[in-house]
């Protein structure tokens, strides 16, 4: 076992989160400080240069980092130290997409891709989808 936190230098030094331990939850779900919910497992961790997005509001890791981000030049590294519920995971990804100027508001089965001035929408199920211009 190598001491110094889980994830090594990538997580600790680049992303900026020091992970001490991970564990399964006793509860079915736990609440995060931003209103999201996590399931199954989480990490006992602390910031090491990253910006806090959400911490565990309930459960054994209350007060520990659940989601963090760190600006690295013109990019942003995101860290998710838990498994979010399906609704929370979708909201998390949509929030990141919105920060990047990507429209991610379609159906769950619809993939939206922007290539230059073109927007391509692909429905991966047999749904009828109305697409509006703009």
Q: Where are the regions a protein language model picked out?
A:
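A conserved amphipathic helix/loop scaffold
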Residues: 1-134
């Amino acid at each position: 076992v190598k001491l110094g936190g889980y994830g090594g230098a990538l997580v600790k030094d680049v992303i900026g989160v020091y992970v001490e331990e991970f564990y399964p939850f006793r509860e079915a779900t736990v609440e995060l400080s931003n209103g999201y919910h996590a399931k199954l497992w989480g990490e006992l961790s602390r910031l090491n240069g990253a910006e806090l997005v959400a911490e565990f509001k309930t459960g054994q890791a209350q007060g520990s980092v659940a989601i963090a981000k760190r600006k690295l030049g013109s990019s942003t590294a995101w860290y998710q130290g838990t498994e979010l519920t399906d609704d929370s995971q979708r909201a998390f990804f949509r929030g990141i997409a919105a920060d990047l100027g990507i429209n991610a508001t379609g159906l769950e089965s619809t993939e939206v891709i922007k290539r230059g001035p073109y927007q391509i929408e692909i429905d991966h199920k047999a749904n009828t989808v109305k697409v509006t211009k703009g």
